[in-house]
């Protein structure tokens, strides 16, 4: 999984042509919607030109989350195009990819798998002060899912199955706070 994430980071940086980081464009951020679901997260948004930025947010579920016996880890990557005069302070649209690995127990079955939501998003960053912003965004796209399911039959035997699924769904919901460092 770490190798896949490394490859994704390299590809994103190559595709979007990071040549220099702008002096006034580094922000530390967190998604409050994630915290509300007991998924602590921290991220960074880095301006790569006068009207674009890249972001990375790491999510890790809490030990006992809202879904009993659930555990997941995700790393969201994104590219944003800012329509205002300066990045990190206006309307934006972008693309996101969020590779994730999860393990959960639902009723009598255990599910373990990987998923990859790929989508487009739109949002707005509201400045509260020179350094502090509130950010709201929503994204839709495709969700690719592969999971192994282990359950117990009525006879008490362990039954294993695998499932691949592709669906159109929301890919991210963000109500976040960001603090501009530079």
Which functions belong to the PLM regions below?
Residues 7-15:
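Bacterial N-terminal signal peptides
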Residues 17-23:
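Sec/Tat signal peptide C-region and signal peptidase I cleavage site
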Residues 25-27, 103-107, 156-162:
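Extracytoplasmic loops and strand-loop junctions of Gram-negative outer membrane beta-barrel proteins
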Residues 38-41, 119:
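Short, surface-exposed coil-to-beta transition loops
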Residues 46-136, 174-182:
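Gram-negative (and chloroplast) outer-membrane scaffold detector with strong preference
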């Amino acid at each position: 999984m770490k190798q896949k994430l490394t490859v994704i980071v390299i590809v994103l940086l190559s595709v979007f042509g990071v040549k220099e980081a702008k002096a006034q464009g580094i922000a530390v951020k967190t998604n409050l919607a994630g915290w509300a679901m007991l998924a602590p997260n921290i991220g960074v948004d880095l301006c790569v030109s006068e009207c674009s930025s890249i972001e990375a947010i790491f999510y890790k579920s809490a030990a006992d989350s809202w879904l009993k016996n659930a555990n997941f880890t995700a790393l969201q990557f994104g590219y944003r195009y800012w329509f205002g005069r300066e990045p990190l302070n206006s309307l934006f649209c972008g693309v996101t990819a969020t590779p994730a690995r999860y393990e959960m127990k639902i009723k009598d079955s255990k599910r373990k798998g990987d998923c990859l939501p790929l989508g487009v998003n739109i949002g707005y960053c509201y400045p509260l002060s020179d350094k502090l912003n509130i950010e709201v965004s929503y994204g839709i796209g495709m969700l690719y899912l592969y999971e192994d399911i282990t359950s117990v039959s009525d006879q008490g035997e362990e039954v294993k199955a695998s499932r691949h699924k592709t669906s159109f769904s929301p890919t991210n919901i963000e109500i976040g706070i960001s603090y501009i460092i530079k």
